[in-house]
Amino acid sequence: MRIGATSDLHGVLPAVEECDIFLICGDIMPLNIQLNMPKSRLWLQNTFIPWANGLPCKHVVFIAGNHDFWFERNGGLELDMYNMFHKPTDGKLVYLHNKSWEYEHEIEPGVFKKFKIFGTPYCKQFGNWAFMREPERLEAKYAHMPSDCDILISHDAPRLLGLGEIHERAWAGEDAGNPWLADEIMRKQPKHCFCGHIHSGCHGIQEFNGMKFSNVSLVNEDYVVSYKPLYLNV
């Protein structure tokens, strides 16, 4: 199965290669409307959903991030999310609000392999942004990650392998990764982990203890597109 992954679009909708599943690890909304709920909804309906529905893939699986205030307010309303994203796209768009989704991929005629994807928007606290929680609540949220998770998409970067290390501007050299997310990853051992949030965190694929990791932010710390979506076979 070929997957693509990106994060931190901030309103930029990139060209996407053909793949089976395309993953988006949060911070979808344009910065200039992130606090405006009516404009955010209109942008999702009139711009994001048509773009995602037209991508050359079977499914687009996405989560929210700390700039996605509309999802902080509405993302937990499962029926509303179903009617807004799933129903009008015949199931192509899948929004995960700290939950799992399973996909059966046909690896050869009549033979299917199941993949379990868990997505969480929750981040460690740093300012007054969406989905930021104190450690005890983060631990409770991350505990929902299944022990048989194949693919993890998180907005926050775990404090592992430099995924959350800032490489640009005044904070360069600081590891802003999330230790509570890292702890849960080490407990549950998902096979593939994709994140964003720390725009200049370590991109490319890294391997540790049989797991593969990548920060897939599209933009740099100045919110300028500096990276491309990542593609790999799983």
List PLM regions with ranges.
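Extreme N-terminal starter segment of soluble prokaryotic enzymes
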Residues: 1-3
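Binuclear metal-dependent hydrolase catalytic cores centered on His/Asp/Glu-rich metal-binding motifs
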Residues: 112-151, 171-179
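Active-site neighborhood of phospho(di)ester-bond hydrolases with catalytic His/Asp-centered motifs
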Residues: 5-7, 22-27, 59-66, 95-98, ...
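Core catalytic region of metal-dependent phosphoesterases/phosphodiesterases
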Residues: 6-107, 177
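Active-site-proximal segments of metal-dependent phosphoesterases and phosphodiesterases across multiple
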Residues: 29, 34-44, 79, 127, ...
